[in-house]
Amino acid sequence: MTTVQEAVPNLIPTQDATPRPAPKKVEAGVKLRGADKVARIPVKIIPTDELPKKPDWIRVRIPVSPEVDRIKQLLRKHKLHSVCEEASCPNLGECFSGGTATFMIMGDICTRRCPFCDVGHGRPKPLDVDEPKNLAVAIADLRLKYVVITSVDRDDLRDGGAQHFADCIREIRALSPGVQLETLVPDYRGRMDVALEITAQEPPDVFNHNLETVPRLYKAARPGSDYDWSLDLLQKFKQMVPHVPTKSGLMLGLGETDEEVIEVMHRMREHDIDMLTLGQYLQPSRSHLPVQRFVHPDTFAWFAEEGYKMGFKNVASGPLVRSSYHADQQAHEAKIKL
């Protein structure tokens, strides 16, 4: 079990007070990634010499399938983005080969610059007013039964993008009335009340927002975000729409301790969160936050056991688990009637 004393020193190499070049000017529509992206956060990330070698339980075989190409072509046809591609998800091959995808709306440029994430940062373009209809058509073409919709952060919008989520849900249900929808939303920083009022009018079947990491690591891992704000967002939605299950997740391997993970899980239950995902953080590039540890599958299994003891309806906990990975199975196993 990892202690705080063991975890804290490991974070020191990621911070440096030495001068650094001025970050590149951000132009509208230009996507910054890697070193250009993390250069704009308060805590300097020192590039690692090389990416860490993954243990055997982390390695993924990339299946070769025409279905992968078909879905990619369909996304391009409808001018859509998948978080599977943008965030370099290790499960992309499996999900695409199975004919499913998690759709990322509101563009592929995020106004945040979290150094664990591989999605590009910058000044996004205006919303595509045709995206809700295009998304609905694509989902109908794929004949999907369970769909996850997520987004980049859009701090440039007065409602944080909540109305665009609602428009997408409305269009999808019009063309595919039997589809079940899970939304993985941003934190709506400074816009919680207006965003939740809109969301409550057109709620999804599962409302998901990730805490991502333990509060001690927020400054380094989630600059611009607030741990308690995210918990409140999930609880307030549950109070407004009590019949819709809520869900959240954590990445492990950023320097947290097992005790801190358990404490966050308790806080989640105190805020009426129903479903939990726990997965291993994988460093997207040398310029991102380094992996501090690879959590053993047995430890993930232990977290799942503890989660069920706390009252979570479902816990998906494993090295390759991601928030939207097998989300349909998770909802089904939780026996949630959608």
Swiss-Prot record:
[4Fe-4S] cluster 1 binds at residues 84, 89, 95, 324. The keyword 4Fe-4S applies. One of its GO terms (molecular function) is 4 iron, 4 sulfur cluster binding. Keywords: 4Fe-4S, Cytoplasm, Iron, Iron-sulfur, Metal-binding, S-adenosyl-L-methionine, Transferase. Its main location: cytoplasm. Residues 1-24 are annotated as: Disordered. It catalyses: [[Fe-S] cluster scaffold protein carrying a second [4Fe-4S](2+) cluster] + N(6)-octanoyl-L-lysyl-[protein] + 2 oxidized [2Fe-2S]-[ferredoxin] + 2 S-adenosyl-L-methionine + 4 H(+) = [[Fe-S] cluster scaffold protein] + N(6)-[(R)-dihydrolipoyl]-L-lysyl-[protein] + 4 Fe(3+) + 2 hydrogen sulfide + 2 5'-deoxyadenosine + 2 L-methionine + 2 reduced [2Fe-2S]-[ferredoxin]. Its EC number is 2.8.1.8. It comes from the Bacteria. It is found in: Cytoplasm. GO terms for cellular component: cytoplasm. CDD domains: Radical_SAM. InterPro entries: Aldolase_TIM, Elp3/MiaA/NifB-like_rSAM, LIAS_N, Lipoyl_synth, rSAM. Residues 96-313 form the Radical SAM core domain. Binds 2 [4Fe-4S] clusters per subunit. One cluster is coordinated with 3 cysteines and an exchangeable S-adenosyl-L-methionine. Pathway: Protein modification; protein lipoylation via endogenous pathway; protein N(6)-(lipoyl)lysine from octanoyl-[acyl-carrier-protein]: step 2/2. Its cofactor is [4Fe-4S] cluster. [4Fe-4S] cluster 2 binds at residues 110, 114, 117. SMART domains: Elp3. HAMAP family: Lipoyl_synth. Belongs to the radical SAM superfamily. Lipoyl synthase family. This is Lipoyl synthase. It comes from Pseudomonas putida (strain W619). The lineage of its organism: Bacteria, Pseudomonadati, Pseudomonadota, Gammaproteobacteria, Pseudomonadales.
